[in-house]
């Protein structure tokens, strides 16, 4: 297994798909990476040479991925909470942030139903 950005990516998959195992890289980004580095998206990772893997590692090192990206997202949410803005309050109360209805649905965000106290 090749190790890129601290993640073991599978050898037996296409490069385009294998790169999506890295947090912060989806299909579109991985396709763009392959295009910029001159690596075929359909090539299997096990068929790539060490030089090609180094080029991929260098290109990914320029991006914000994995732990840095997770930290950045958490800091953005913390900033919203500290500001006390509407979105921050929604995060704080574990409610949907982007305007979805909450009278019905939103169970994933709100958690299991709580019994009504009389």
From Swiss-Prot:
One of its GO terms (biological process) is translation. One of its GO terms (molecular function) is structural constituent of ribosome. The keyword Transport does not apply. GO terms for cellular component: cytosol; small ribosomal subunit. Pfam families: Ribosomal_S13 (PF00416). Keywords: Ribonucleoprotein, Ribosomal protein, RNA-binding, rRNA-binding, tRNA-binding. Residues 91-118 are annotated as: Disordered. The keyword Manganese does not apply. PANTHER family: 30S RIBOSOMAL PROTEIN S13/40S RIBOSOMAL PROTEIN S18 (PTHR10871), SMALL RIBOSOMAL SUBUNIT PROTEIN US13M (PTHR10871:SF1). Belongs to the universal ribosomal protein uS13 family. Part of the 30S ribosomal subunit. Forms a loose heterodimer with protein S19. Forms two bridges to the 50S subunit in the 70S ribosome. Located at the top of the head of the 30S subunit, it contacts several helices of the 16S rRNA. In the 70S ribosome it contacts the 23S rRNA (bridge B1a) and protein L5 of the 50S subunit (bridge B1b), connecting the 2 subunits; these bridges are implicated in subunit movement. Contacts the tRNAs in the A and P-sites. This is Small ribosomal subunit protein uS13. It comes from Hahella chejuensis (strain KCTC 2396).
